[in-house]
């Protein structure tokens, strides 16, 4: 299961995790899709928004190590993070803080960010910002001949 959480809950979880052995990995629907494409030999790019914190830098570094062209905007909010809890029987639940990623607005997307790509895959969480209905973004996709796909699992 997954539960969206606020900053206060995130801080409590981080305090709890600071006393445990943890593992950090990149993820998210779009992040996992881009990682898979890179492993298959494609040359994907990633547009998103991160905080100027250790998680944002970790995410940027991971994408760059995989040769993914990063087009990451930064903001003062913490980076989005999904804190994962796994029970002894393998059941998983996520406490998801969207953070900086949730502030990405269509107005921040420039036509040159789409140049050279054939597909645009939008993370489901960004649908809450109506980023998929923005005429500016749509015109950028049309101008650059980009097919627009979005994750509706949110």
Task: Put a short name on every predicted segment.
Residues 1, 22, 60-75, 79-154:
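Ribokinase/PfkB-type carbohydrate-kinase core domain
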Residues 26, 52, 130-131:
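Charged, low-complexity surface patches
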Residues 6, 44-70:
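A glycine-rich beta-to-alpha transition motif near the start of alpha/beta enzyme domains, typified by
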């Amino acid at each position: 299961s997954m539960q969206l959480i606020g900053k206060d809950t995130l801080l409590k979880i981080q305090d709890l995790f600071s006393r445990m052995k943890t593992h950090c990995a990149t993820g998210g629907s779009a992040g996992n899709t881009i990682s898979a494409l890179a492993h298959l030999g494609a040359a994907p790019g990633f547009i998103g928004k991160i905080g100027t914190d250790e998680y944002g830098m970790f995410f940027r570094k991971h994408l760059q190590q995989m040769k993914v062209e990063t087009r990451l905007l930064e903001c003062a909010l913490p980076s989005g993070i999904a804190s994962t809890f796994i029970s002894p029987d393998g059941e998983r639940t996520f406490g998801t803080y969207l953070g900086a990623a949730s502030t990405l607005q269509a107005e921040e997307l420039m036509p040159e960010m789409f140049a050279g790509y054939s597909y645009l895959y939008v993370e489901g969480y960004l649908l809450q910002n109506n980023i998929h209905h923005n005429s500016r973004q749509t015109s950028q996709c049309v101008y650059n001949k980009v097919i627009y796909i979005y994750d509706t699992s949110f």
